[in-house]
């Protein structure tokens, strides 16, 4: 005998039990009960700090060499390795990025210069002292106008002139490497 439609199990759906994610505890009724606090204390967000700096690449009077600053690598156990970078520093209140760049180059290297053109802007994030730092650095190309090469003792370990063709290979920071490589035609 053939069952009539709807008379048997055909056409009826079985109710599925809803699965909960493995990392979730079963829900229980808490009516009349106070919820128990989490065992882990909430982790506070790191404070965000915005910093704006300016600097760049100074080209010597011959047009063949660029100026870099070297700082000791804090991760080097022997303390001998230098991290080479472009001279730069914070923009002070009332300064334009151009004014700050010229001042910072002179302070860190002893070299006076004038800006010939913009090189670009680097924007990045890092953690320091428990704070999230958002840093924007305005970079320029400079022409040397005078001064005597001398490292600023409080911030820089060494300064030096290097052939322009070697600058990208010497730079320690990938963002600066990319910026110079992208603008290589401006250095010729």
Stretches found by the model and what they are:
Residues 139, 143, 148-181:
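NUDIX/MutT-family hydrolases
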